[in-house]
Amino acid sequence: MFLSRSIPQAFSLRYTTRYGKLILRPGRRFVSSEIQQKDEQAGESNTATDTGIIHKTEQETLIYFDNVYPRAMSLWSPTQWYNLLMSNQTRNAVRAKIFKFANPPDNPIHNLELRSTIPIKRDGGVFATFLVPPNYTTAEVNAMIQKNTQQESSKSWFSFFTEVTAFPVKGSPWIEDLRRLPSNQIRVKFEGGFLTEEEVYALFRRYGTIINIYPNPKEMTYLISYRSFRGAICAKNCVSGMEVHNSIIHVQYEQLTQGHVISDFFVNHTRIAVPLLLALLSILAVIVFDPIREFTIEQKITHKYSLSWDNYFLKKILSVTSSTMSSVKEYWGITDRHVQKRQLWEERQEKVADLKLWLQENNNTFVVLRGPRGSGKHELVMQHTLHDRPNVLYLDCDKLIKSRTDAKFLRNAASQLGYFPIFPWVNSVTNLLDLAVQGLTGQKSGLSESKELQFRNMLSTAMMSIRHIALKGYKPVIGSGDSIINVKEEDYLQQHPEKKPVIVIDRFNNRAEMNGFVYKELSDWAAMLVQMNLAHVIFLTETVSPNQLLAESLPNQVFKMMTLSDASKKSARRYVLAQLQETTEDDDDIDTSKPLDLNEKFVHEIDDSLDPIGGRMLDLQAFVRRVKSGEQPKEALEKMVEQASEQITQIFLSGSADPLRGAQAWELIELLSANGSIRFRDIIYRPLFKAAPEAALLDLEKNGFVTMTRDRGVLTDIYPAKPLFCAAFQYLLNNKEMYNVLRTSYLLRMVTFETGRIKKWEEELRALGKVSDQKMFRSRLAYLAGKIDASSAAIDDCESEVKELSKK
């Protein structure tokens, strides 16, 4: 039995001299036989898989076949999965393949026997042990196997990639599964004498083209660089362990120590690398995420795949079903007991008709719908005008404006637009990276984006989605045969206004304490949509102030203006009675066990209740709900007045409110409760309003306390924000206990206000008292003294009134 040699474990040293030099000649002791004996004594396996050593007899020959498996170029090479997926890579299939290459029918080696195969999948090859037939020598068998393998593997059309080569193994190969990946360079170590470069070339050239040989006499090694991986792999597996001139050759792959090119580039060229990385990330984001975002925005507008009643296909089914049932009922003379719930008074019906007509005209559909808070602008547009339209996008500015953090703002904006996916946390990370890059390079990377820019990008993506929806059925060419008509996109949109989406922007204003840029961005975006004729845009606003902002975004254009006012008493009465006459079976929160009896007395009570309620849409709807739930009209009115008064006290008269604004609100309550309206010129001379009357009133109007009329931009009259507030003002004044508390709070605020004024004047008097010539400021001193006397008298009056109120 021939046992291949393993790595020497011990050396016995002998010393000789030659030409005056000391030469070390190691006396070698092989350890493989001892290891084999130990394994046999322990009853362990001696296979090549367990020991890394291939055993063969003198009657056997060992051949290495290359390019049988896909070789591993890295630790995570995906080509290795090919061995698991393909059936022709199994052990039996490989044995049959190798035997076919070595012993083909057209040039057989008689009585050739394949004893064993040992796959080396990392190197892509197989060690095969053949039994040499008696009529052949080992050299003859090796030569024939090499020739047959070369001829058989080259018959395939893909032989350039799949050709297999066979080489006799001259050494004692070491079968290891260490993490030493193949490379095109091998390190040859000599245990004993050092071969010449010519001898090394002659020994290793047969396995592949050698690019260069790098000798290292000090370490007794050669570095051989092959042109291909195959040459280095075959040389390593066939020559390693070979003995030449009493020198044992050890061959290992040389691991190429390549520098980290990418990391070095980033470290050494940050000013170029960082912008380049940002550009690549931006391109990747556009390629991957923008199509997804455009699709989600289209879904938000059309509801085509949404799981709701707005689903496109569900609407089609319901439309067909409803039409069919209506036809059947009409044929049998059956009428619906349910009255259509979309009740409007005549003025509102005309508004709805005008809006629908403007959307059909397709001529600069830029509508501004103005009305006080609670006038029903949202209901008029969304429920009565656009309820049957399949492509509507609703944006609520209030949710965007009130977002306190950048991440919350971006999430709210994305939610309203249907912009998905979005990564708000990236903004915080990029800010930190921007600071780090600025510290390294001295300049900003431009990685971080402001929320204004991100919001603008969202709107740009939404514009692309809107364009896709508007041009869904567009065909550039119409006709067949000789009659072909080219149709432009502009002409198609002009002829099909129903294809264009409707953008509804609610609670639009022109300024805000935070996130005020939203109004400007939405205004510019809407103007661009209208100019490109891609969509109809409807703005819902409470005041006339946004008109200037819209005019800046869309100059030289006349807006379609529509104003919603409170209903007249006649229209409000008709609306309420029509609502009360409806069957309430579909209302889950209303008790229908007690049907309403609309007798003359009941109608008279409703008429009396509608006087203080007025014609505000939301108040009328609240009144109807209360009456339907079982409350009497008078009781419903009282509760609504109490609720309105509570709202006023909590927002404007509570301790958390601004003291000055609270005092101004109470003064207006007393004036408006007596007259119903007051002129602006009667307010500007009052002490609380004298400093900035218009700013104070605008702030109260913004918070929904009062509403004002203007004549050519100048304030003229002041009214309560809604008619119900008049009754609430009267309630606050007539309730003695509440009146005493609120009046006392107002008087104390007046005392504080007048005291602050006196302190300011006293400081001026103190400064004037230091002047030597008092005659120069005699008139100013008299003026200040008069002011102080007047304020002191006002304080005395307030304090005396507080005492009187405390006694009640």
UniProtKB/Swiss-Prot annotation:
A Pfam match is RNA12
Indicate the segments forming the RRM domain, all copies.
184-256
Could you give a GO molecular-function term held by this entry? RNA binding
Please indicate the ranges of residues that lie on the Mitochondrial intermembrane side.
293-808
Q: How would you describe this protein's topology in the membrane?
A: Single-pass membrane protein
- Annotated CDD domains: RRM_Yme2p_like
Q: Which domain of life is it from?
A: Eukaryota
User: Which residue ranges are assigned to the Mitochondrial matrix compartment in the record's topology?
Assistant: 31-271
Q: Which residues form a coiled coil?
A: none
Presequence boundaries? 1-30
List keywords of the entry alphabetically.
Membrane, Mitochondrion, Mitochondrion inner membrane, mRNA processing, RNA-binding, Transit peptide, Transmembrane, Transmembrane helix
**Gene Ontology annotations for the cellular component aspect, listed alphabetically:** mitochondrial inner membrane
Q: Show the InterPro entries listed in the entry.
A: Mt_escape_2_C, P-loop_NTPase, RBD_domain_sf, Yme2_C, Yme2_RRM
The keyword Transmembrane helix is assigned to this record: yes
Set out the biological process GO terms recorded for this chain's protein: mitochondrial genome maintenance; mRNA processing
What residues form the membrane-spanning segments?
A: 272-292
Q: Write out the annotated subcellular location.
A: Mitochondrion inner membrane
The record's section on PANTHER family has: MITOCHONDRIAL ESCAPE PROTEIN 2
**What is known about what this protein does?**
Plays a role in maintaining the mitochondrial genome and in controlling the mtDNA escape. Involved in the regulation of mtDNA nucleotide structure and number. May have a dispensable role in early maturation of pre-rRNA.
Its family remark reads:
Belongs to the YME2 family.
What name does UniProt use for this protein? Answer: Mitochondrial escape protein 2
Could you tell me which species this protein originates from?
A: Kluyveromyces lactis (strain ATCC 8585 / CBS 2359 / DSM 70799 / NBRC 1267 / NRRL Y-1140 / WM37) (Yeast)
**Lineage of the organism:** Eukaryota, Fungi, Dikarya, Ascomycota, Saccharomycotina
